[in-house]
Amino acid sequence: MKKKWYIVLTMSGYEEKVKENIEKKVEATGIKNLVGRIVIPEEVVLDATSPSERLILSPKAKLHVNNGKDVNKGDLIAEEPPIYARRSGVIVDVKNVRKIVVETIDRKYTKTYYIPESAGIEPGLRVGTKVKQGLPLSKNEEYICELDGKIVEIERMKKVVVQTPDGEQDVYYIPLDVFDRDRIKKGKEVKQGEMLAEARKFFAKVSGRVEVVDYSTRKEIRIYKTKRRKLFPGYVFVEMIMNDEAYNFVRSVPYVMGFVSSGGQPVPVKDREMRPILRLAGLEEYEEKKKPVKVELGFKVGDMVKIISGPFEDFAGVIKEIDPERQELKVNVTIFGRETPVVLHVSEVEKIE
């Protein structure tokens, strides 16, 4: 006889304990022929409304992560290319500077300032500080903010000036963590193409989900902390052959309150409803369609949509929330008689006219 899936009811918060208790009891009694796999459906959700980590990179930076992928703390996520001398010459100046990047509120434009440490940085300037046009950035007021926005990056760097034989000057800004004082010295001659600084590597400071944004003047990597959330609190899905022995076996497990039943009889879960549960648990494969770079949002709250890819493929639901920036929709789908919110990319749904 083929096993079917049933829903075991428990108190919310005791799902893992019930799963553990059933597995231990199956192992101890050896009735694997009656009780099989056990699944607690979970989804990964963002744990915060703002990025846990934000990295601003040059357009030439090489990315080692993709949009929507999960990373662990310490993973290599990006690297800036090495810095090479554009022309031959002599290093005539090496100074400490502070790099300050100001971004407009709409995130469309940025302005970068390199302020000599000798000029003094205005007190109170830090990442996240809102600034207005005309605000002094240095104590000597030689460096003035030219746009309204907020500071998104502050970093100590070295300004290296190389004077060419014809009297012109090439300026390089080298981050302190790749600055080599043996390589960069005042009075040292450098050849065209000579490496002034090695590639700068960036490692994830936190674990989470990656969002990559590609602007014309820069690249950004944002890492959002994530957490796992029970999709159906109080439900544990058990694959079993339903007979008196199996019923009493599961029913006697601590914290089990019963089965989802009709007329006093446990009701097996329909294959169509079980399919997304198995996909989320990694027990059934499905084709994950690639998301386009940009999709025009043609949806509004209240629209009825059909899910066309992912674990909930072929289910229909109603749009409850729209996130235009991430091109994501929160859709309520009805499964097992419950309305369950799922977050989907706009490319994973189509509107039902």
Curated annotation (Swiss-Prot):
Q: Which residues form a coiled coil?
A: none
Query: Domain KOW spans what residues?
Result: 301-335
Q: Name one Pfam family in it.
A: KOW
Record text on activity regulation: Regulated by autoinhibition via interaction of the N-terminal and the C-terminal domains. Autoinhibition may prevent NusG from interacting prematurely with other components of the transcription complex or non-specific interactions with other cellular components.
BP-aspect Gene Ontology terms: DNA-templated transcription termination; regulation of DNA-templated transcription elongation; transcription antitermination; transcription elongation-coupled chromatin remodeling
Q: Which UniProt keywords apply?
A: Transcription, Transcription antitermination, Transcription regulation, Transcription termination
User: Is the Acetylation keyword given for this protein?
Assistant: no
Q: Does the keyword Nucleus apply?
A: no
**Which Gene Ontology cellular component annotation is one that this UniProt entry carries?**
cytosol
What role does this protein play? Answer: Participates in transcription elongation, termination and antitermination.
In the record, the note on similarity to other proteins reads: Belongs to the NusG family.
- UniProt note: domains: The N-terminal domain interacts with RNAP and the C-terminal domain binds either to Rho or to RpsJ (NusE). Contains an additional, species-specific domain inserted into the N-terminal domain. The N-terminal and C-terminal domains can interact and form a closed conformation.
This protein's name: Transcription termination/antitermination protein NusG
Q: What organism is recorded for this protein?
A: Thermotoga maritima (strain ATCC 43589 / DSM 3109 / JCM 10099 / NBRC 100826 / MSB8)
Q: Which gene encodes it?
A: nusG
